[in-house]
Structure formats: structure tokens, C-alpha cells
């Protein structure tokens, strides 16, 4: 079947699902490969995998996950070799060809890099080669990191024009309360896309392994949803995976949004960390709703100092109404000067 006639599914597998008692789960990898093989005639598959830092840390006898950038980079560099070799061995046993792809956040702002990455991934899929993707931690900086593979997988979903993003985690899906702390927590099977409803679910949990808790999974669903892509959050089992591929109800299914937003603005909204918060008046809010830039004279209060290029939360009446990138620093504030340009501003 031609690549254009196949649906593309992006599968993100988290560290807590992939690592079993300090080792890569052979059961999961074999089941993943076997079921991809069975569905390869009708679907293209892209894998976004975690696990490199954990595997590298164990190889280097780190007792806990490193916190410094240098140690994270070393652990990732060591672990990435083991990770991709295990994928290659298991997938080759099922006559599947994989390709390692390491990417950085630069591709969001660099049009040429974005186009090149898109072309490379599409060509791999056209040749029935399965891209196995991870962030290039070794060359990334704090400022130029996705920070977690949940949001990376959402960006990849956009690049390959996926029909669905499947997030494999150690929980059955999204819950109305943190199931680790509340025995009455109930799993939510189905969510109509609504950013405010999803935002209400963000403070749920954070896992001990890896960098992505449930908040980043919700952000990934928001990024994907605003690009017309469904997200399904499941715990790993062979049946759950097959059901998700075949469109059956399992875990939590988050539908796509009717509204589409450009990738750069999606990253500003859900991927970029804010360093400051500013309060604005009604006039400024009405102006940005009409597609105008945010001017300094609409700012009522600055909560923290900021520099050019910093992320800023924009607040009206104690509600986060927008987010953007500072065009000037806080000590340059002056009437009628643009604080956040409309191209770097998104209303939430």
C-alpha cells in the first residue's frame, strides 16, 4: 500500500514502561515489534522512545537520575547505544528495519531544519523503515531542549501528519484525581478536546523515572489536538496496543480540536517554560484578541524581571489569558513599545 494510503501512528514509550527491574523490557519490545509487523500493511509507525538516560545511568552506576546537564548528556550518550541496539535486534527478528533519528528543538524555529526533518521521516516511511526517535540530549542545551519525550512525540506527530498519537505509560489513562493518592480516582475514558478541561487535569502526578509526568502528556495532547491529531493514553499490554491501533476504546482517548494553530505558537503555549508573569488591563486584552501585539502601556504589573526571549505568562483578573516571548527586557518597558509581538503571542 502506498504511504499516502496508510494511516500513520506515532507511539511514545515512557521510561517506566520500557525499563523493567533495571533492564530493557524484552517482553514489551517483542510484543511491540510483532504487532507493528501485523499492522504494517495498513499503517505507518513512528516510535518515540525514552530510556537512554536510565540505561546509561545504570551502565555508569549512577544511583539516581542525574540532575546536572553534563551527567545527563553522558548518561544519554552511553545509554542511546544500548537502547537502539536492543530495538534493532528485536525488530530485525521480525523482519523490520529501523532507523535511529535524534532531533533537537531547533527544528521548530529553523524552517530549513523542519523541512529536512519532514522529508527524511517521510522517506523512511515510504521505504517501510520505522523511525525510532529520541531527543539529541548530547548536543541540546537547557534553552534548546524539548525537555520530555511526550511533547517531542506531539511535534513528531505533526511532522509526519499522524492520525493518532499513542502515549504508553505506567497508568491505564488519565484520571480525575491522582490515583496514587486518592483511592476514589476514576479513569476518564473519553475527552472532547477542550483546552480548559485539559488544563484542569494537569496537576495530576509526576513519575520518578524520566522527565514526563501526566502534565506533559496533557500538554502533548494539546499540541497534537490543535493540529488535528487524536491522542490515546494507555498502559502497556499487547491487547491495549492492538485496540489503540484499531481504534477501539482503551485507556483515555482525547479527540482533536476543530481549531488549528501553527506549530510555533503551540510550542509557545505548551512547550516553553515561562520565567515571568505580567498583568494587563482590559484594553490590552481586547487588542490582542483582535490580533494586535501586546504594548507596554497595557501592562499593569510585572511580577518578575525578564530578558529578551524569555517566556511570559499574561494574566488578566488572576486568569492566564495568553503567553508569549518577550521582545524587550523588563527594564526597557516604555509606553507604546511592543512588549510581545503578535507572532510570538498566543491567547489561551
Q: What kind of feature is each model-predicted range?
A:
Residues 1-62, 68-97, 101-348:
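C-terminal catalytic "cap/lid" subdomain
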Amino acid at each position: 500500500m502506498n504511504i499516502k494510503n496508510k494511516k500513520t501512528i506515532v507511539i511514545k514509550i515512557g521510561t517506566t514502561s520500557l525499563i523493567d527491574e533495571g533492564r530493557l523490557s524484552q517482553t514489551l519490545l517483542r510484543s511491540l515489534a510483532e504487532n507493528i509487523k501485523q499492522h504494517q500493511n495498513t499503517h505507518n509507525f513512528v516510535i518515540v522512545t525514552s530510556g537512554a538516560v536510565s540505561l546509561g545511568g545504570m551502565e555508569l552506576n549512577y544511583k539516581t537520575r542525574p540532575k546536572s546537564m553534563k551527567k545527563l548528556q553522558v548518561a544519554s550518550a552511553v545509554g542511546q547505544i544500548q537502547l537502539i541496539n536492543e530495538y534493532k535486534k528485536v525488530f530485525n527478528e521480525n523482519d523490520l528495519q529501523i532507523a535511529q533519528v535524534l532531533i533537537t528543538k531547533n527544528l521548530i524555529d529553523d524552517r530549513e531544519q523542519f523541512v529536512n526533518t519532514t522529508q527524511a521521516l517521510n522517506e523512511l516511511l515510504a521505504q517501510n523503515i520505522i523511525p525510532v526517535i529520541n531527543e539529541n540530549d548530547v548536543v541540546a542545551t537547557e534553552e534548546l531542549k524539548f525537555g520530555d519525550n511526550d511533547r517531542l512525540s506531539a511535534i513528531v506527530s505533526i511532522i509526519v501528519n499522524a492520525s493518532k498519537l499513542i502515549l504508553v505509560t505506567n497508568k491505564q489513562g488519565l484520571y480525575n484525581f491522582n490515583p496514587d493518592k486518592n483511592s476514589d480516582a476514576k479513569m476518564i475514558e473519553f475527552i472532547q478536546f477542550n483546552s480548559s478541561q485539559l488544563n484542569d487535569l494537569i496537576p495530576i502526578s509526576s513519575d520518578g523515572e524520566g522527565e514526563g509526568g501526566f502534565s506533559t502528556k496533557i500538554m502533548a495532547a494539546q499540541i497534537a489536538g490543535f493540529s488535528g491529531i487524536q491522542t490515546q493514553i494507555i498502559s502497556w499490554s499487547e491487547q491495549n496496543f492492538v485496540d489503540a491501533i484499531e481504534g477501539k476504546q482503551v485507556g483515555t482517548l482525547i479527540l482533536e480540536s476543530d481549531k488549528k494553530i501553527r506549530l510555533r505558537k503551540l510550542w509557545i503555549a505548551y512547550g516553553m517554560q515561562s520565567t515571568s508573569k505580567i498583568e494587563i488591563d482590559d484594553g490590552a486584552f481586547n487588542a490582542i484578541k483582535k490580533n494586535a501585539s501586546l504594548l507596554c502601556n497595557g501592562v499593569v504589573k510585572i511580577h518578575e524581571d525578564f530578558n529578551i526571549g524569555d517566556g511570559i505568562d499574561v494574566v488578566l483578573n488572576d486568569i492566564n489569558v495568553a503567553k508569549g516571548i518577550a521582545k524587550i527586557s523588563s527594564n526597557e518597558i516604555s509606553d507604546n513599545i511592543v512588549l510581545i509581538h503578535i507572532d510570538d503571542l498566543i491567547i489561551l
